[in-house]
Amino acid sequence: MSMSPSRLVLASNNAGKLAELQALFASLGVALVAQSTLNIPEADEPFHTFVENALAKARHASLHSGLPAIADDAGLCVDAFAGLPGVQTAFYCTQFGYPKSDDNNRKALLEQMVGVTQRRAALVSTLVAVRSAQDPEPLIATGRAVGEITTELLGDKGFGFDPVMWIPSMGKTFAQMPEDEKNALSHRGQAAKAMLALMQSRWFS
């Protein structure tokens, strides 16, 4: 059955992620509401894959809000580290004794990459949307942006690993790109574009 939700709960308290997805979903006429504004606690993320964690977060947000929900699980997969940190990206720096933060994640990554010549990496995003906590047919979209880890921070836009993710085809990092340019190329932008198409055909038709 098709539906046209006017509000969609975002299962994240990350302000950068909320702003980015709000811009990407504006064309649907749907208001994205951060789960924190509804006093919804963060869900557990016990799984080893992005899709399982995103689904768990979406179901959790929908269960506690009674609204359709969307969740993003994203991370950095570094070739030289056999695909890690992966689903543990947000906590990457904590294994090296740093408090959890974007700044410390970037600092720890650059420190661990000193002397590493294989700098290829991918930022991966998986978006999952559910109509209800029991939705048997969640919408799933993925995006992947491949680049190279820089040796220093470049650019002051964006968030997360944007200042260290060099995109060779553009000759700059995500943090050096205007928002519209980044959204067209980024992992989250790719996933959001695919999710928009799914929603338009399945929920809004």
Where in the sequence are the language-model features?
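Anionic-ligand binding patches
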Residues: 3-9, 15-33, 37-205
